[in-house]
């Protein structure tokens, strides 16, 4: 598929997925989030990972709060995204407790993240990551992912490959409504290792 056609197909699919997500009730979003939290906690890749990056969820994403609490209860090391909005650059920076999240300033997307002047341990500078939880608008069962069009995670995964010998395991968290038959992709789009949703089988 030509680049312009891929871009057009992505735009169209993003619109459709946003409609699907808007149609979900808060109760259904919470129900599926709880199911996925339990799947994550039982997942072999999660259990063996020590250094984990996880996104702080927006309203139309799987709620990650319970997973974050479990990361700390198990003594794992937790990193969250710090986006630079003037570019597609993103770092994963360390937080020390779940309670810290409520004290962070919020971005224009209403996501808490440490400010630019807040000096923190950055994952790729101190040993890399074992596991990255991936957000997204849509996914297919082959691991193709449709993001929001900014390219933050694709660029970050490429940096991971330059900084660490073993690629981090990538685990996408999705509502059933976000699973597509086929996600249009180009050569810059990075596949995820596994898409986790209510009806998926887990490792």
From Swiss-Prot:
GO terms for cellular component: cytoplasm; cytosol; mitochondrial matrix; mitochondrion. It catalyses: (6S)-5-formyl-5,6,7,8-tetrahydrofolate + ATP = (6R)-5,10-methenyltetrahydrofolate + ADP + phosphate. The modification N-acetylalanine is found at residue 2. Its EC number is 6.3.3.2. It is found in: Cytoplasm. Changing residue 145 to A: Reduces activity by 98%. Keywords: Acetylation, ATP-binding, Cytoplasm, Disease variant, Epilepsy, Folate-binding, Ligase, Magnesium, Metal-binding, Nucleotide-binding. Substrate binds at residues 56, 61, 148-152. Its cofactor is Mg(2+). InterPro entries: FTHF_cligase, FTHF_cligase-like_sf, NagB/RpiA_transferase-like. Its main location: cytoplasm. Changing residue 153 to A: Reduces activity by 97%. ATP binds at residues 10-14, 145-153. Gene3D superfamilies: NagB/RpiA/CoA transferase-like. It is an enzyme of class 6 (ligase). Mg(2+) binds at residues 154, 189. Changing residue 61 to A: Reduces activity by 94%. One of its GO terms (molecular function) is 5-formyltetrahydrofolate cyclo-ligase activity. GO terms for biological process: folic acid catabolic process; folic acid metabolic process; folic acid-containing compound biosynthetic process; formate metabolic process; glutamate metabolic process; tetrahydrofolate interconversion; tetrahydrofolate metabolic process. It is linked to Neurodevelopmental disorder with microcephaly, epilepsy, and hypomyelination: An autosomal recessive neurodevelopmental disorder with onset at birth or in early infancy, and characterized by microcephaly, short stature, severe global developmental delay, progressive spasticity, and epilepsy. Brain imaging shows delayed myelination, hypomyelination, enlarged ventricles, and cerebellar atrophy. Monomer. Contributes to tetrahydrofolate metabolism. Helps regulate carbon flow through the folate-dependent one-carbon metabolic network that supplies carbon for the biosynthesis of purines, thymidine and amino acids. Catalyzes the irreversible conversion of 5-formyltetrahydrofolate (5-FTHF) to yield 5,10-methenyltetrahydrofolate. PANTHER family: 5-FORMYLTETRAHYDROFOLATE CYCLO-LIGASE, ATPASE INHIBITOR/5-FORMYLTETRAHYDROFOLATE CYCLO-LIGASE. Belongs to the 5-formyltetrahydrofolate cyclo-ligase family. This is 5-formyltetrahydrofolate cyclo-ligase. It comes from Homo sapiens. The gene is MTHFS.
């Amino acid at each position: 598929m030509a680049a312009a056609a891929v871009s057009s197909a992505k735009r169209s699919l993003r619109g459709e997925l946003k409609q699907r997500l808007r149609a979900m009730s808060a109760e259904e979003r919470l129900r599926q989030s709880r199911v996925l939290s339990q799947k994550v906690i039982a997942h072999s890749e999660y259990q063996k990972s020590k250094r984990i990056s996880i996104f702080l969820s927006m309203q139309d994403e799987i709620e990650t709060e319970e997973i974050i609490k479990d990361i700390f209860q198990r003594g794992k090391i937790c990193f969250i995204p710090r986006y630079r909005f003037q570019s597609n650059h993103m770092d994963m920076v360390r937080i020390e407790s779940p309670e810290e999240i409520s004290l962070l300033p919020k971005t224009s997307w209403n996501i808490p993240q440490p400010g630019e002047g807040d000096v923190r341990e950055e994952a790729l500078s101190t040993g890399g990551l074992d596991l990255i939880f991936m957000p997204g608008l849509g996914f297919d069962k082959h691991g193709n992912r449709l993001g929001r069009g900014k390219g933050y995670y694709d660029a970050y995964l490429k940096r991971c490959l330059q900084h660490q010998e073993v690629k981090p395991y990538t685990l996408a968290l999705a509502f059933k409504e976000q699973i597509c038959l086929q996600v249009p992709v180009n050569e810059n789009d990075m596949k995820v290792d596994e898409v986790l949703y209510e009806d998926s089988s887990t490792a």
